[in-house]
Amino acid sequence: MLGSSPYFKRLSVGLYCPYEGLSDLVVSLKLLYALKYIYNAKVIVFGSKVNESLARAIEFIDEYVELSYDIKYEKDKRKNRDIINEFMLDYIIPLRAGNKSINFLKSTNAKFIIIRTKEELEYSSRFIFVNFENNKKLQQSNEFLRVLYRARSINSALFDKEISKLSFDIDIQTKKKHKEKIDNFFKNINNPLNSILISPFAKETKYNLRLKDYIKFIKEARTKYPYLNFIVLTNEKTHENFLEHIDKIDEKLLKSIYIFKNDGDILNICELLKRVKCLIAPSSGTMYLATILKINSIGLYSLHDTVYWESFNKNYVLLEKIKDGLSKTDIQNAIGMLLFKLAEFLRK
């Protein structure tokens, strides 16, 4: 029953993810949704500046608190600990379960810490371990589901009763400024609905093509589909790198494609994704965001990631080797398969 729960005491539950990656918060959204609509919990996210705008656009996150990720200094640990302790949490859930993070969270006043880890940890009665090894369904499920099931540790009977009632329609509401920014970007583009977004950059995976391979793909795709608009997503750190590559390979191509340089606000990417026909990207934060938003995509994935990071429409070009290990033949095959998948998608 959405919005209410037979669980009478209002719980206070925190997600600990003060990391710099977009994927950390995105992969946790179904977990946070369940915490709100199964337990009617007060949901607090302790995160980084990177994810702030996204978190504040999601109605089932009650509070977003920025923490310092670098806690090697005692004063930073104390500051983070004091911030967390203010919330008197019933549960805290670290997204990553390294020894340093767990030991830090043990020093807070959170009653219980829900973790999944194979690290050797000093026993604490406050630990609640999530064991996937005895659950065949979860062993073979995607990471969104595996993170979601950490919520089951709070009250398994209630979770099992209510989980099938949840729709997981996660709407990320962008603001007027984001809509206007994307409106302005598309102002000089003919037929914006015929746009393909390409996001070539990824910190999360080694399974990817090189920039020059993406440029070769774009060049061939432009020739085959001149009516399509190809948009490349960059940011402050990657923009110049992309321009240098395209300038070396084919400077004329720059005049026939579009580049959206994001300013760091994730909600710009959300609004852009909602406007395009399809996303082409490796297994990355942008792809996971498209999955949550139910946007069609073609993913450059390892076989492992097709299981653990499956996309909305499960449409992949498989890469059997990491980027640095790809031969010329491997790259040609991947580009050929991308073109085939794009043609297949456009026929539907």
Each predicted region: which residue ranges?
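Catalytic machinery of carbohydrate-active enzymes
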Residues: 1-348
